[in-house]
Amino acid sequence: MGLTLSGRYISLFLAVQIAYLLQAVRAAGKCGTVFKGFSDCLLQLGENMANYPQELDEKENLQTICTYWDDFHSCATTALADCQEGATDLWEKLKKESRNLDFRGSLFELCAGGNGAIRSSVPFGVTLLITALSALVTWMQF
């Protein structure tokens, strides 16, 4: 299956939402390190995905990827924790909206209950890396 046009739009949507979140935090002016912290989270996620062990079986592969995904969310929540003006609430809202997107093979779907197997013909790490990098590029333009 791989990335489709609708998958690109969903990735763009998520990137715009993340950029909106960061812009709102920056406008609040009370989170001096939020950009550095959040970008560090994205970079760590990308690094993990680019370097995860290829020799794992499908179940171990999914568990490893989901661990990286969970670590990213923990990192992002921590980066936003010191911010005021509802930045953490915006992040939680973004995660909820992202879970509700009907995007087969998303990390929210695959990591929700350990139920999924990777069905995409594109390596999952590539898909996630592209999504994370598009968010980072969008963020850097602000």
Swiss-Prot record:
It is a lipid-anchor; GPI-anchor. Pfam families: NRN1. Residues 1-27 form the signal peptide. It is found in: Cell membrane; Synapse. Its main location: membrane. GO terms for biological process: neuron projection extension. Residues 113-142 form a propeptide. InterPro entries: Neuritin_fam (IPR026144). Keywords: Cell membrane, Glycoprotein, GPI-anchor, Lipoprotein, Membrane, Signal, Synapse. The keyword tRNA-binding does not apply. PANTHER family: NEURITIN, NEURITIN-RELATED. Modulates postsynaptic dendritic arbor elaboration and synaptic maturation. This is Neuritin.
